Amino acid sequence: MPPPRTREGRGHRDRDHHRAPREEEAPEKWDWNCPETRCLLEDVFFRDEDYIRRGSEECQKFWAFFERLQRFQHLKTSQKKKKDPGMPKHGIAALADLPLTYDPRYRINLSILSPDTRGRHGPGRGLPPERVSEFRRALLHYLDFQQKQAFGRLAKLQRERAALPIAQYGNRILQTLKEHQVVVVAGDTGCGKSTQVPQYLLAAGFSHVACTQPRRIACISLAKRVGFESLSQYGSQVGYQIRFESTRSAATKIVFLTVGLLLRQIQREPSLPQYQVLIVDEVHERHLHNDFLLGVLQRLLPQRPDLKVILMSATINISLFSSYFSHAPVVQVPGRLFPITVVYQPQEADQTASKSEKLDPRPFLRVLEAIDNKYPPEERGDLLVFLSGMAEITTVLDAAQAYASLTQRWVVLPLHSALSVSDQDKVFDVAPAGVRKCILSTNIAETSVTIDGIRFVVDSGKVKEMSYDPQAKLQRLQEFWISQASAEQRKGRAGRTGPGVCYRLYAESDYDAFAPYPVPEIRRVALDALVLQMKSMSVGDPRTFPFIEPPPPASVETAILYLQEQGALDSSEALTPIGSLLAQLPVDVVIGKMLILGSMFSLAEPVLTIAAALSVQSPFTRSAQSNLDCATARRPLESDQGDPFTLFNVFNAWVQVKSERSGNSRKWCRRRGVEEHRLYEMANLRRQFKELLEDHGLLSGAQVVAPGDSYSRLQQRRERRALHQLKRQHEEGGGRRRKVLRLQEDGCSSDEEDRKGSTSQRADSVDIQDVKFKLRHNLEQLQAAASSAQDLTRDQLALLKLVLGRGLYPQLAVPDAFNSGRKDSDQIFHTQAKQGTVLHPTCVFANSPEVLHTQGQEASGQEGSQDGRDQMSCKHQLLAFVSLLETNKPYLVNCVRIPALQSLLLFSRSIDTNGDCSRLVADGWLELQLADSESAVRLLATSLRLRAHWESALDRQLARQAQRRKLEQEEDVGSPAVSPQEVAALSRELLQFMAAKVPYRLRRLTGLEAQNLYVGPQTITTAPSLPGLFGNSTLSPHPTKGGYAVSDYLTYNCLTSDTDLYSDCLRSFWTCPHCGLHMPFTPLERIAHENTCPEAPGDDPGSEEAAPAPPQKTSALQRPYHCQVCGQDFLFTPTEVLRHRRQHV
């Protein structure tokens, strides 16, 4: 008989009845892969303050681990059900509290907070408790797995560090540093000095250590490596500081920074009180700034006896560095190179290419074929080929890729500085099984880049180095034989990970004839930037500075003269106000001048962009030059005004694409053959320039306008929070991961790239450069500046070209007289020091040179004249260029066209005239012949006045800002400010002057004409009785040219001609347009009267009530005279008094 049904029992059975279906249905309804389920769990366990943050790469790794764990547990559960013997029971009372079954989680020695301990009102309150517990166990297993992996890496890392050769010398280095102020650590490649010495110092208790590197990429990689080797136990105590980027904080104890940044810090604080130890790495490379830093440290050490210095070098010329620092002790560490077999394969005489021929790629292909025949593909080992330049890399690349497509055993990759960052990173990827990498590199892989897995090296024995020719004033990229030290460095790349082979494509006798060491950079480059920095740091005369190896005296003198010509140094070689500011701008002098000059006018935004664009490498990729599709897509951005304006248009268009939410800037750049990384550099430089100009008061600070409504502000905060999370995720993930390369018919790519295809913008494909760009810059402000700059008026464009022209002067080129009859590629131009230059292939004028020709209706020459030498035109143009680079030809790089006559009158350092001023010679090499002498005199007088006003306004502005900074924003800073009204008036007058239409001839003087240009010193020793052109200036005979020195740049009547000797006595009647005076004047008297006429406009363009300057006495016969009729005061000779009275009759 069944038991009676009670309420309790019935209720219990009902609960069981209702619970049973739910328990049976739960496994079917619960889905771990459901997005809503995962979102709830991430809200509970993966918050911002947790170890794993939601959306991070670590979060994605956990879910992959979780899926594998679920499959494993499901398999284990199904096997357990088949052979389950029943639950065991404890027979011992003491073990009653232990679990009945073993679970691996009991070995996990950590715990995490569960949702119960966080409160029942959190986001996970709707989750079943049993599912939360199951998820928590999975999370514990994952953390335990990660911990075991970390301990495994730690053990491996400690073994690797202990195996480094320098590990046996750590205590010796510290002891030597304790006893001496300077220590030289010399170690061969692979000894570990760059990563281990900073850690030894940190472990020894040093807390302020700076380690300099010659390149930015080395600072980043070493800082990350040191942080990794310390397992981040020092946290933020290891950081790096480079241009535009820094991870340095108040807690940083070791900072890796570039040499240039350390010199800037010395410029601000000469004693470097913030550092205890300075490590100068790679001193053997003999870079310009490294040599200068050593000289600065030699002077600083006696003043800072507590400062320690470690010089780290390869085993190259160690005695030079030791003796420079009073025979500092040397700790020499052996390298860890495996045996390297050297094979000399000199080229035959018929295989040696001449200077005009391409490199013969056959010797390099024979090496590839020899490796294929001798070594089975199962033996790993890649090939590194050292070539002299990009042209040589391209030649060998084409031949090697053809060979690789036949054998399917090679992946050929180029490596040089002009490649995009993504293409450079491919050399670190892994080749598939049975395939080797063939890396074609310049000397960048000699010391700057270390590539693992290299077993074979091919050394061409050549290198291209930049040198400066002070006579021709050009940079020359020439091919040289390398030094023995460089040859050993290249050979060492083959023995880092195992026995290697080095193929030298030259004879052993050639190696013996090599120079032992490379030529220091200080002995072959222009020194103007270095001299300017030395003047700013007040380290004394550059001629007597104690360099480790002094530069050629001629290079120092050339640099000083160049800085004086640019206005950065005065006649006593002291810094001028503009020179002080130029020394603080991290750009060439000409680019810095553009920024300073442009800050005066309302053209700050376009000048900032152009200056930044001219300060980086060309953003146009090398392959895009021959790609018709890229050229067609880029054509709307090209400007017929010149390359700076083309770069200006490219940057503005890119900013517009960036500001569009649906815009794909990477695709936009690729279609136009533009390297986006260069555009990011432009944006960073532009911001830095703007901040520097704002700091010096030359540019008003931008007002950041916040979004008006609360929703927009909230949306902006969310976007920045997401960007910060993406950046943190990238940094935690270690950046770019190595990929597996795959063979393709036209080159190579990575498997990951192929998988992404057109979906490269997915969430898991983070463009870290784009993230940093949006965090660093205000995109709305950039877009507004780009939009306004696209609508430059004609006046703004003319004024902008004027600023660029003055900034680039004296870097001018004049077109050859026969260019109109030449092909586009044969256009020839001449500079003052170099004849026969041509346009660079990337120049916009190389494809459309007709805009530089003076012909048709704009020119009126003699009938039948085809060469343009006798053309009278008001449209003659000059090319202002940023640099002159000679490779196989001398090329003009980054050119802009400017009007010839007005530019020469405003910029020339020397202007010489004949008697009636119809013939002018600028800087002793360009001749201007004007048909109308009256127009010539009028233009000359106007240019004199405008130059004086411009110089005065610029000097007052710079001097006022310098005084303001010096007196810390005091109200009375001495010199008057430059008012906006004055700047606006000066701009209007400059534009009117530039718009003047005066026909003239332009030609370059021959060498013989330049030698017989001047009349020479005259027997007349006194100046004519003429009022001065300026307030305190007086006329005096020029001691060498002859004629009369009107100003420091204008010499009147000094050019040879039949009438020049008597022209100062030849007068013609002229009526003053201001006071109506009608009398005979010489051209010089007319200029003088126009500048001192009481009825003429005041000298101050911005002051309407400015009183005229009092006349200055320039002759012994002049006496003060007050006219009763007109009420004016004059300084007149008796004859001039009679003339003045006659005009009132």
UniProtKB/Swiss-Prot annotation:
Q: Name one GO biological process term.
A: positive regulation of phosphorylation
Q: What SUPFAM superfamilies does the annotation carry?
A: P-loop containing nucleoside triphosphate hydrolases (SSF52540)
- Amino acids binding ATP: 187-194
Q: Where is the composition biased (Basic and acidic residues)?
A: 1-14
Return the InterPro entries for the record.
Answer: DEAD-box_helicase_OB_fold, DEAD/DEAH_box_helicase_dom, DHX34_Znf-C2H2, HA2_WH, Helicase-assoc_dom, Helicase_ATP-bd, Helicase_C-like, P-loop_NTPase
Q: Quote the PROSITE patterns the UniProt record gives.
A: HELICASE_ATP_BIND_1 (PS51192), HELICASE_CTER (PS51194)
Task: Cite the Helicase C-terminal domain residue spans from the record.
Answer: 370-538
Q: Where is the Helicase ATP-binding domain?
A: 174-334
| Region span, Disordered | 1-27, 726-764, 1091-1114
Q: What is its EC number?
A: 3.6.4.13
* Catalytic activity line of the entry: ATP + H2O = ADP + phosphate + H(+)
Q: Any keyword Phosphoprotein?
A: yes
Superkingdom of this protein's organism:
Eukaryota
One Pfam family hit: OB_NTP_bind
Q: Which UniProt keywords apply?
A: ATP-binding, Helicase, Hydrolase, Nucleotide-binding, Phosphoprotein, RNA-binding
Motif window: DEAH box? 281-284
Q: Where, per the database record, does this protein carry Phosphoserine? A: 749-750
Keyword ATP-binding attributed: yes
Recorded GO molecular functions are:
ATP binding; ATP hydrolysis activity; RNA binding; RNA helicase activity
Q: How does it assemble?
A: Forms a complex with RUVBL1 and RUVBL2. Part of a complex composed of SMG1, DHX34 and UPF1; within the complex DHX34 acts as a scaffolding protein to facilitate SMG1 phosphorylation of UPF1. Interacts with UPF1, MOV10, EIF4A3, XRN2, SMG6, SMG7, SMG9, UPF3A, UPF3B, CASC3/MLN51, XRN1, DIS3 and DCP1A; the interactions are RNA-independent. Interacts with NCBP1/CPB80; the interaction is RNA-dependent. Interacts (via C-terminus) with SMG1; the interaction is RNA-independent.
Q: Of which family is this protein a member?
A: Belongs to the DEAD box helicase family. DEAH subfamily.
Q: What does this protein do?
A: Probable ATP-binding RNA helicase. Required for nonsense-mediated decay (NMD) degradation of mRNA transcripts containing premature stop codons. Promotes the phosphorylation of UPF1 along with its interaction with key NMD pathway proteins UPF2 and EIF4A3. Negatively regulates the nucleotide binding ability and ATP hydrolysis of the RUVBL1-RUVBL2 complex via induction of N-terminus conformation changes of the RUVBL2 subunits.
Q: What is this protein called?
A: Probable ATP-dependent RNA helicase DHX34
- Say which species the protein is native to: Mus musculus (Mouse)
GN (gene name): Dhx34
